[in-house]
Amino acid sequence: MADDNLLTTLDTYLASGIHIGTQQKTEDMKRFIYRVRADGLYVLDVRKTDERIGLAAKFLSKYEPEEILAVSRRIYSVGPLKKFGQTTGITTAAGRFVPGTLTNPSSRKFLEPEVLFLSDPRIDRQALKEAIEIGIPIVGMCDTEHLTSFIDFIIPTNNKGRKSVSLVYYLIAREYMKNRGLIGEDVPFTYEEFLEKAMSVKVKVKPQQFQRGRRWGKRR
């Protein structure tokens, strides 16, 4: 059960390391930072992260699953990202983002999403660049060192840890489906299932593995 109106328990957030940033910060991310530790690591404000996850899910829930493209090139995000796509029906692209995916209609992998959800604005810079070019909104997981000029909706989080990334994907999947009336309080999937996918990654990711989105029934 969540506490103090959080999406999950504070203990779950802290155990995932979702609040652990880097030893660098930008002015863009300063408003989400709670403190700096003695070892120089910046710590994110968990309650602000929780709030932004909820708001991001609410924003994404305005779109059909096939209108959203979720991408990640970071290897430990691939498993949770695929689980995210399987759970929600949202289109996902894991691994290297092939140039022209959003801008070249002649490409076999050409997609026309209405919104982009990325796991790291630096690692996923090709997808970010193309989303900017075609003018669609961008939701992004951002750590303390990121520049966020082109991110329309920031989710402040540790986007490098397996546990933290798995938790973000799980919570957004859950809240997205709740907001669209597809599930109720009895959630048919767990954070542990997302985390298991992250922990099982041992091999190099193949270039751009797609999962096409699917349309669910009408929202309630």
From Swiss-Prot:
It comes from the Archaea. Keywords: Ribonucleoprotein, Ribosomal protein. InterPro entries: Ribosomal_uS2, Ribosomal_uS2_arc, Ribosomal_uS2_CS, Ribosomal_uS2_euk/arc, Ribosomal_uS2_flav_dom_sf. Pfam families: Ribosomal_S2 (PF00318). SUPFAM superfamilies: Ribosomal protein S2. Transmembrane segments: none annotated. One of its GO terms (biological process) is translation. One of its GO terms (cellular component) is small ribosomal subunit. GO terms for molecular function: structural constituent of ribosome. Coiled coil: none annotated. The keyword Chaperone does not apply. HAMAP family: Ribosomal_uS2_A. Belongs to the universal ribosomal protein uS2 family. This is Small ribosomal subunit protein uS2. It comes from Methanococcus aeolicus (strain ATCC BAA-1280 / DSM 17508 / OCM 812 / Nankai-3).
